Regions:
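Short amphipathic alpha-helical segments
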Residues: 16-18, 41, 74-77, 101-104, ...
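Rossmann-fold NAD(P) dinucleotide-binding segment
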Residues: 51-114
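Amphipathic alpha-helical hairpins
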Residues: 3, 10, 14, 18, ...
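Rossmann-fold dinucleotide-binding core
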Residues: 95-170
Length: 170
């Protein structure tokens, strides 16, 4: 699969590395910290310079692994018009109480499929591919994402209804 990744940082590096290990083509974009980007490019990822270049790469999936809801929403608003319904957004961001529901609303404007999957564990577990994941979204979107989730998640808790994932965080 062709996979994009926004947020290759502390947690994202290990997740991205495992996506590569499982023979998926990975496209990444840098933000503030060059070190994880340089490392993942050495592992075989392709670096792109803009959201437009990333979103126009014919992606099957786009991972979002950023610090919080406001950052995720800002990125969502920038990419929504660049993606098509052929790309599912898999959101690993740890959102605030309504963050993932708001993110899904942002993407719905252009019919972009969305799956929330906050993870349990840290950078070590991410690199080992043994994170826990709580998945929220439609069954169809879960099926589309399952192969990629298995690259880095050992235990998947499926809540299907997006709002249920948020309630589990509090």
């Amino acid at each position: 699969m062709k996979v994009g990744f926004i947020g290759v940082g502390w947690m994202g590096f290990g997740i991205a590395k495992n996506i590569l290990k499982n023979n998926h083509e990975l496209f990444v974009i840098a933000n503030k910290n060059r070190k994880p980007i340089d490392r993942i490019v050495k592992e075989g990822a392709k670096e792109v310079k803009s959201y437009e270049e990333l979103c126009k790469s014919g992606l099957d999936a786009l991972f979002l692994c950023v610090t919080n809801s406001p950052i995720a929403h800002e990125i969502g608003k920038k990419i929504v018009s660049l993606l098509t319904d052929k790309t599912i957004v898999i959101d690993i961001t740890t959102h605030n109480q309504n963050g993932s529901v708001e993110m899904e609303e942002i993407l719905k404007v252009n019919n972009i499929p969305y799956l929330e999957c906050p993870v349990m564990g840290g950078p070590v577990q991410a690199e080992e591919g043994v994170l826990g994941g709580i998945v929220g979204g439609s069954e169809e979107n879960l099926k589309r994402s399952e192969e990629l989730l298995k690259c880095f998640v050992k235990i998947i808790i499926i809540l299907v209804v997006l709002e249920m994932v948020q309630k589990q965080n509090y």
